[in-house]
């Protein structure tokens, strides 16, 4: 993906920190059954996990009986996911396709659900690429299928930039990124670019990611422009809108 910052990919430092940054069991506790319940409510069987990462969601759903196809562009994360799958005694079905070209590899209406979780669309910096990706997700979804996608509350980053860069960064640690051994802080906040630093407690091991900060309602507008008619928004997995939420999750119907 040419529009993705090269330094975001194949970083062993970030991949090695990731398990302690997420904490799989606490992530599941934080979502309180949200993902499984949402898929079951919408009678989902086949799932395209567009951002495999270390396998947290794909492995969980495979163990829950869903038919999962996983995708990732990062070779180091794929290795880590395969390692985790072996530990959990499940077999991953992995592809490494460019999101913007999914229609070349999958037929229209191939999946009941597409997942783009873990704040992953933020790796794309250009609106054209963001929109094209969402349209590709729409294309490979079956009629009445759902896209489940999330984003960090970047409006907070942008509004409180000065305080955050002084070291006063607010994050509950209860949702999505729940580990206590690895911490992440913004070290640069610009209009169209945020740099996050990930480090262990002793700061001996560090890694950075460069991310696009979606403004409030920006992703929601892109989802509508991509063709999704019914878009439900959740704040930290709760229905009401909370301007101080850590994460926003969208369930979008084709």
Regions found by a protein language model. Give the residues of each.
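Conserved class I S-adenosyl-L-methionine
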Residues: 1-53
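SAM-dependent methyltransferase
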Residues: 148-221
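A short glycine-rich, Lys/Arg-flanked "PGG" loop and its adjoining helix->strand segment in the class I
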Residues: 131-143
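A short acidic, Gly/Pro-enriched loop at the edge of an enzyme's catalytic core
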Residues: 104-113
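A short SAM/SAH-binding and catalytic strip from SAM-dependent methyltransferases
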Residues: 112-128
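Class I SAM-dependent methyltransferase SAM/SAH-binding core
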Residues: 56-102
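C-terminal lobe and adjacent flexible extensions of AdoMet/dcAdoMet transferase-like proteins
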Residues: 216-254
């Amino acid at each position: 993906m040419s529009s993705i910052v090269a330094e975001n990919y194949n970083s062993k430092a970030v991949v090695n920190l990731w398990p302690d940054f997420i904490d799989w069991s606490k992530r599941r506790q934080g979502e309180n059954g949200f993902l499984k319940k949402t898929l079951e409510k919408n009678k989902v069987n086949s799932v395209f996990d567009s951002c495999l990462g270390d396998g947290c969601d794909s492995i969980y759903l495979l163990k829950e009986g869903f038919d999962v196809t996983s995708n990732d562009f990062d070779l180091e994360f794929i290795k880590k996911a395969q390692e985790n799958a072996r530990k959990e005694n499940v077999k991953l079905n992995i592809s490494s396709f460019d999101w913007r070209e999914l229609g070349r590899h999958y037929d229209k209406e191939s999946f009941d659900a597409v997942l783009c979780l873990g704040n992953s669309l933020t790796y794309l910096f250009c609106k054209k690429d963001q929109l094209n990706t969402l349209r590709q997700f729409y294309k490979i979804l079956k009629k009445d299928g759902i896209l489940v996608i999330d984003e960090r509350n970047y409006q907070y980053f942008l509004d409180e930039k000065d305080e955050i860069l002084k070291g006063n960064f607010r994050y509950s640690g209860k949702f999505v990124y729940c580990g206590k051994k690895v911490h992440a802080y913004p070290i640069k906040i610009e209009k169209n670019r945020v740099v996050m630093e990930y480090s262990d407690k002793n700061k001996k091991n560090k890694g950075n990611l460069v991310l696009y900060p979606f403004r409030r309602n920006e992703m929601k507008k892109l989802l509508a422009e991509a063709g999704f008619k019914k878009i439900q928004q959740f704040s930290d997995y709760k229905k009401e809108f909370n301007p101080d939420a850590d994460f926003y999750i969208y369930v979008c119907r084709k």
